[in-house]
Regions:
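Non-heme Fe(II) oxygenase metal-center motifs and adjacent flexible, charged/small-residue loops
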Residues: 1-212
Length: 212
């Protein structure tokens, strides 16, 4: 499973730096439509290559399968989920979650509690158009904060209901993106397949209670 990953050409500076988050005051907000918005902060986690290596090594990555019509197909990525009462696998994840919780508490009104991780091994791994609408995300404004480590991949967004991609964010190497407001129920996001991916990527998604 993990052996399928193509080589990751990380920056020697990224690997040499202390692995730690920077300040959040450089965040840039993009207002979408219908009360949705996206915040973006490139390179929030310095030295993120170290975190990537640790997570690849220590996580019990799970290869999911799903029923599709008459066939059972492999989900094109590896996953691991940590609920609000579970211990996160790396102390830096606790730090990232707590910093984001404090920053967004005035808007969200509650902390981020869970962490879902996805490992995109190469450009063939992907996630289709969707919103995080399991639980309260289908009816309430919420926040999903995503920290990316490893090689960059494109996060695409479009209004719910179909149509062309309206916004693209290149995410990797410690980048942060936060989807907020009505984004999960009025917009969709995806990680498209890529023929130009330069290596594997891990997406770390922090969510509040009751949002998946």
């Amino acid at each position: 499973m993990i052996e399928r990953m193509i080589g990751l050409q990380g920056s020697i500076f990224d690997l040499a730096e202390e692995c730690a988050p920077g300040p959040l005051d450089g965040m840039q907000r993009t207002e979408l439509t219908r009360g949705a918005w996206v915040d973006h902060l490139p390179g929030w986690v310095q030295g993120s290559g170290q975190l990537f290596d640790r997570l690849v090594e220590v996580l019990p990555w799970h290869a999911e399968e799903r029923q599709m019509y008459d066939n059972v197909v492999a989900v094109p990525r590896l996953t691991k989920y940590y609920g609000s009462r579970e211990t996160l696998p790396d102390p830096l994840l606790d730090d990232l979650r707590d910093r984001l919780s404090a920053h967004y508490l005035p808007e969200l009104g509650e902390p981020l509690t869970s962490a879902g991780l996805c490992l995109y091994r190469d450009g063939a791994d992907s996630v289709a158009w969707h919103g995080d609408t399991i639980g309260r995300g289908s009816t309430h404004d919420t926040i999903v904060a995503i920290v990316s480590v490893g090689a960059a991949r494109t996060l695409a967004l479009r209004p719910r209901g179909g149509g062309p991609t309206a916004h693209r964010f290149s995410l990797g190497h410690g980048d942060l993106v936060v989807m907020g407001g009505s984004c999960q129920r009025t917009w969709e996001h995806a990680i498209p397949k890529s023929t130009s991916a330069t290596g594997p990527r891990i997406s770390i998604q922090f969510r509040p209670r009751g949002v998946r």
